Amino acid sequence: MLTEKLILASASPRRAELLQLLGVDFEVIPSHMDETSRNDETPPEHVQRLSSEKAEMIAALFPDALVLGADTVVVIAGRMLGKPGNPGEARDMLKRLSGREHIVYTGFSLIQKKKGRRRTQVVRSAVLFKEIPEDEISWYVSSEEPYDKAGGYAVQGMGAFFIREIRGSYTNVMGLPLSEVVETLKDMGSLTFSGDQHDRGSNQE
């Protein structure tokens, strides 16, 4: 159970779904920021900065709460891929990823402003795509699934059949490395696993 109020500073339904797996109570208050990368940033630096800035923005409004911010990018051949803004961008991203391995970086930050507590971590996963035929790319782009996901695909959705192999955290590719988040919460003293969880199912209905 959580020992303090937790706020997820993200509008991502995937991140909320992953946190729900823990059976903990949390509030979603998205932070709306410019996610443009800086010229001098590496991908890990980019996601680390944005996750921290997202958490900091909401923590300033709720200094007593523990705020979780996160950011994810896909990187292939040194190029960062964010979220496609239109069908053309989605198609270009999938063509670029087809038959190749790419890296997914997710940065997450936990901030409790009143007590001056802050933790930030970046997690890396490698994903290998199959060769994707043109008709499959066209079908997937028309599904509308690509448009709010880094790299233009959803590992937990229809995009899963593009994937040959994942090395590293699956939940990291979804947008939140759950194992690392849990360990950080435990290390901060904000999450304990004492108590009976047999009523968890009824509490989630």
Swiss-Prot record:
Pfam families: Maf
Signal sequence, renumbered to the chain: none
GO biological process: nucleotide metabolic process
EC number: 3.6.1.9
Residue positions of the active site: D71
Annotated site residue numbers, Important for substrate specificity: R14, T72, Q156
UniProt keyword Ion transport present: no
Known role: Nucleoside triphosphate pyrophosphatase that hydrolyzes dTTP and UTP. May have a dual role in cell division arrest and in preventing the incorporation of modified nucleotides into cellular nucleic acids.
Family statement drawn from the similarity comment of this UniProt entry: Belongs to the Maf family. YhdE subfamily.
Name recorded for this polypeptide: dTTP/UTP pyrophosphatase
Species of provenance: Syntrophus aciditrophicus (strain SB)
